[in-house]
């Protein structure tokens, strides 16, 4: 079962940001398409 963005807690979203920010491409995508989309694109879910 997939988890929609609305189901993530602020703590979970912050964890995704911390993983993504070490990857400049992921961080850039997060700025334009959102953290959940960027994390999923680079790291799967």
UniProtKB/Swiss-Prot annotation:
Q: Which residues bind Ca(2+) 3?
A: 21, 27
Q: Chief location of this protein? A: secreted
Q: Per the database record, which ranges form the Gla domain?
A: 1-44
**PROSITE patterns per UniProt:** GLA_1, GLA_2
Question: InterPro entries attached here?
Answer: GLA-like_dom_SF (IPR035972), GLA_domain (IPR000294), Osteocalcin (IPR039176)
Query: Where does the signal peptide begin and end?
Result: none
Q: What intrachain disulfides are recorded?
A: 20-26
Q: What are the record's GO terms for cellular component?
A: extracellular matrix; extracellular region
Residue positions annotated to bind Ca(2+) 2 are 18, 21
- Modification(s) after translation: Gamma-carboxyglutamate residues are formed by vitamin K dependent carboxylation by GGCX. These residues are essential for the binding of calcium.
The family note in this entry says: Belongs to the osteocalcin/matrix Gla protein family.
Function, as annotated, reads:
The carboxylated form is one of the main organic components of the bone matrix, which constitutes 1-2% of the total bone protein. The carboxylated form binds strongly to apatite and calcium.
Q: What name goes with this protein? A: Osteocalcin
Q: What organism does the record attribute this protein to?
A: Danio rerio (Zebrafish)
């Amino acid at each position: 079962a997939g988890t929609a963005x609305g189901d993530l807690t602020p703590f979970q979203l912050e964890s995704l940001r911390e993983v993504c920010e070490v990857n400049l491409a992921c961080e850039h995508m997060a700025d334009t398409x959102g953290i959940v989309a960027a994390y999923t694109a680079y790291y799967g879910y």
